[in-house]
């Protein structure tokens, strides 16, 4: 596989084993955005998140997950207090096979979202 080829964005992680598989296959950083079609704050950052994900290095796997289609995963993360609402963007560094992310941003603050992606992309350069 070409090391410079960007990975396709994952759009389905419905079950907990799917999340575990994504963490096991993590090429450097796994970024998962949780949102919903009906969520106003999710829509406000949609363009920014897409742009940031388009800038992802080849060793970053991104996922955009609709919580209405991933009720098991979202419900689990919510009961474990990993997320308190949406939009939520979770960052898992390679080797983290736990459901607790290494970095997270919750809400639609564009500065916080941008800084989150910068931190994640900086991590894969190290």
Residue ranges and their predicted role:
Residues 1-30, 110-126:
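N-terminal leader/targeting and pre-domain segments
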Residues 10-14, 34, 46-74:
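Thiol-based oxidoreductase modules, predominantly thioredoxin-like and allied folds used
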Residues 19-23, 74-81:
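Short amphipathic alpha-helix with an adjacent loop that forms part of the alpha/beta core around
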Residues 26-29, 57-60, 84:
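Eukaryote-biased feature marking scaffold/signaling PDZ-domain proteins and nuclear chromatin regulators
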Residues 30-32, 62, 89:
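Hydrophobic beta-strand anchors of alpha/beta hydrolase catalytic cores
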Residues 35-38, 85:
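Short pre-active-site segment immediately N-terminal to redox-active cysteine/selenocysteine motifs
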Residues 39-42, 89:
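The canonical Cys-X-X-Cys-His
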Residues 82-126:
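Non-catalytic, surface beta->alpha helical segment in thiol-disulfide oxidoreductase systems
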């Amino acid at each position: 596989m070409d090391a410079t080829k960007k990975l396709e964005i994952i759009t389905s992680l419905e079950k907990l084993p799917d999340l575990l598989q994504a963490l096991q296959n993590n090429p450097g950083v796994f970024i998962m955005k949780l949102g919903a079609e009906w969520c106003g704050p999710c829509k406000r950052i949609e363009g920014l998140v897409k742009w940031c994900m388009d800038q992802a290095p080849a060793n970053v796997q991104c996922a955009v997950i609709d919580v209405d289609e991933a009720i098991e995963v979202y419900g689990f993360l919510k009961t474990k207090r990993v997320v308190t609402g949406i939009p939520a963007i979770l960052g898992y560094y390679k080797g983290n096979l736990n459901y607790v992310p290494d970095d997270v941003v919750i809400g639609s603050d564009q500065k916080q979202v941008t800084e989150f992606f910068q931190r994640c992309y900086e991590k894969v350069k190290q």
